[in-house]
Amino acid sequence: MATTAELFEEPFVADEYIERLVWRTPGGGSRGGPEAFDPKRLLEEFVNHIQELQIMDERIQRKVEKLEQQCQKEAKEFAKKVQELQKSNQVAFQHFQELDEHISYVATKVCHLGDQLEGVNTPRQRAVEAQKLMKYFNEFLDGELKSDVFTNPEKIKEAADVIQKLHLIAQELPFDRFSEVKSKIASKYHDLECQLIQEFTSAQRRGEVSRMREVAAVLLHFKGYSHCIDVYIKQCQEGAYLRNDIFEDAAILCQRVNKQVGDIFSNPEAVLAKLIQNVFEVKLQSFVKDQLEECRKSDAEQYLKSLYDLYTRTTSLSSKLMEFNLGTDKQTFLSKLIKSIFVSYLENYIEVEIGYLKSRSAMILQRYYDSKNHQKRSIGTGGIQDLKERIRQRTNLPLGPSIDTHGETFLSQEVVVNLLQETKQAFERCHRLSDPSDLPRNAFRIFTILVEFLCIEHIDYALETGLAGIPSSDSRNANLYFLDVVQQANTIFHLFDKQFNDHLMPLISSSPKLSECLQKKKEIIEQMEMKLDTGIDRTLNCMIGQMKHILAAEQKKTDFKPEDENNVLIQYTNACVKVCAYVRKQVEKIKNSMDGKNVDTVLMELGVRFHRLTYEHLQQYSYSCMGGMLAICDVAEYRKCAKDFKIPMVLHLFDTLHALCNLLVVAPDNLKQVCSGEQLANLDKNILHSFVQLRADYRSARLARHFS
């Protein structure tokens, strides 16, 4: 049976239980191989084990029944005890209710008795108090103070209580009959008040907070209580401003007083508020005035910096003081204190800001032009000047000489950074110093100054000067520096746009000025882009003009119709080499001067014009067979140059031109087949015919029949 119990190990798994039983049975497991297996022995062991399990089950069942009977017995006993306890609890609760009713009855009697005693005692106490006051009043009436309360210095608290009450009584007495005694009481009242204030002062100097609290409590009912607070505030500030930073000193002072004032006065928030008011209206106001008045008229830059710094530090101090208990509306209280200090400076702040920003911006620009030994010229507008400009844009007529700027763009990133930095500081000051209702309007005024000096006086002037410096398209070896102007103008536009978004937008985002600023910015940028487009267009005209000069000077008629057809080296001509070198140089300059889609747009325009020039140039010559091969070599080199543009349309144009040049060399019998090829099939027959007409054998080979 013990063996059977051992087999019931936790956790119990039936399959493992059978395996362990088989394993323990000799001849039952796999030990010894198949020969050692004894099924009869295993069956016998299983039968015996089943009998053991049945016996064990019976024993366990009897034990379970015994335990169930025991549980039922204990449950009945427990239920009986619970019933007895419930009865006992009910009896106790009834006793408790009776006792509670009795206590309530007694309490009612006691309260009634207390009210009766108080009704008797209160008049008696008042009578005793009145008797004492009459006694003290008689002493003042007789002119001789004999009572210990007046003669003993240690009883100043009791004397103060008496004299305060006598003072109130004396005020109700007629003056004609009691003028003398009223005067004596008033004199004593004043003397005691002075003694108490002196005692408070001495206690404060000794650092005796408990004594200060006692005296302040007595003085609370005297007229001189406010004077006591003034004395406390004055003495608190003695030696408080020893550092160079008055704002930090003030913060430390208020923190120290805030910890102490509640232990002394019954109205600590009022005392602390009065201290803060004194600090602001006396100490800080005097300091701010000293700092600002000396530079207000003489140095606008220093004045604005100091005003911003002082206002910022004052508001920072105010934020620290917001942590203290100053009453119900401490935000309004502190705001009024700040306003009282700065109101005279803030009411005309924006005028000073605008005046300074204008003069500073003008100085930055003038300093730059002086460094270039350049005298700004006035840009003509309207009337004849506009007419000449329109004619100049649409034709190549030289309407007066162009201005030689010696490659100077008159754009300076340093100047731009300085102007933006000045404006950024102005925006920061505007944000801090402007009234919230005036902020969008003031920010817009600063923005207009930035537009005036950065966009108009600097960028627009440089663009106008750059436009005036672009030579006519028939000029030779022209210095096309306008692309440098484009590059610098793009960089400046990005900086201008960044400042607009980072510093102006937060100030106007929720006001009607937002749309006005966006519109002004849009107009400025459109105006600049129009001038940039004009300049780029004229620069491209100059580039094409320079290519024309190269081709006219370098290309000879004999290049494409050599005298000795058998002694010709098949390669591109010298004119082609020079044109391609020039084009590659200009393409690189365009890529360096612009970014994004602007590069593709300008390169496509240049590529289209380059293709048109090449096409028209090739139309000027007659081609022999070898000359046609040379023309194909030239166009192949032009096409290779066009690949640098990385514009699919331009490359397609030169591919088509290359295919057209094949018409110059193809055998007459194959001409029709080539014309119907993939690249030429979509072209107008007149274009194909015009190229075939350039062949030297056009008439002799009767090539016109292919187009009839």
Curated annotation (Swiss-Prot):
Residues 40-101 form a coiled coil. Component of the exocyst complex involved in the docking of exocytic vesicles with fusion sites on the plasma membrane. One of its GO terms (cellular component) is midbody. Ubiquitous. PANTHER family: EXOCYST COMPLEX COMPONENT 5, SEC10. The modification Phosphoserine is found at residue 412. Belongs to the SEC10 family. It is found in: Cytoplasm; Midbody. One of its GO terms (biological process) is epithelial cell apoptotic process. The exocyst complex is composed of EXOC1, EXOC2, EXOC3, EXOC4, EXOC5, EXOC6, EXOC7 and EXOC8. Interacts with EXOC3L1. The keyword Transport applies. Its main location: cytoplasm. Keywords: Acetylation, Coiled coil, Cytoplasm, Exocytosis, Phosphoprotein, Protein transport, Transport. The lineage of its organism: Eukaryota, Metazoa, Chordata, Craniata, Vertebrata. The modification N-acetylalanine is found at residue 2. GO terms for molecular function: small GTPase binding. The modification Phosphothreonine is found at residues 122, 395, 405. This is Exocyst complex component 5. InterPro entries: Sec10-like, Sec10_HB, Sec10_N. It comes from Rattus norvegicus (Rat).
